[in-house]
């Protein structure tokens, strides 16, 4: 869901391009997918970090603003949308999140990085790659706030 199937298919296509014999391909694929699964399963649901004396929370979808960070439910961290980015959260932290393609948040329906203009402590970075050709990969350097963008159309043209 939400791009996971496409990711797995891209991995399969990559492995097929290596021109492995079928039995070798199957072994390599199974080992790779098992390692990928274990890696993803063991990732934290959120990361707290401090960069240049500014506290950040990196989270897939967001948090329940009515709960403490330690009291969040896994489903909320992975699936919440509007209630998170439309609500006030701990103003001493900046929340960087994905999951919701920015064309559904930005007033201009772009995939550009979204900055919360009401509470000033949320940054959306989901450039909508799961939506196809219009999408882009958004990255932010937390040291200086510089934004880097790689548009899907530019990758396909290369």
Give residue ranges: language-model regions.
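Acidic, His/Gly-enriched loop-helix segments that form or flank divalent-metal centers
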Residues: 2, 6-124, 128-135
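Binuclear metal-dependent phosphoesterase catalytic core
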Residues: 118-158
């Amino acid at each position: 869901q939400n791009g996971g199937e496409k990711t797995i298919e891209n991995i399969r296509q990559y492995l097929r391009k290596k021109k492995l014999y079928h039995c070798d391909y199957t072994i390599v694929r199974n080992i790779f997918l098992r390692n990928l699964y274990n890696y993803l399963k063991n990732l934290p649901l959120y990361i707290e970090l401090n960069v240049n004396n500014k506290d950040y929370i990196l989270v897939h979808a967001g948090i329940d603003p009515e709960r403490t960070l330690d009291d969040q439910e896994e489903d909320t961290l992975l699936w919440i949308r509007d209630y998170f980015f439309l609500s006030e959260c701990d103003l001493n932290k900046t929340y960087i999140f994905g999951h919701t393609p920015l064309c559904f948040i930005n007033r201009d329906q772009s995939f550009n990085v979204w900055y919360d203009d009401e509470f000033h402590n949320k940054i959306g970075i989901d450039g909508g790659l799961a939506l196809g050709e219009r999408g882009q990969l958004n990255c932010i350097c937390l040291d200086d706030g510089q934004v880097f963008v790689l548009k899907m159309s530019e990758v396909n043209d290369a």
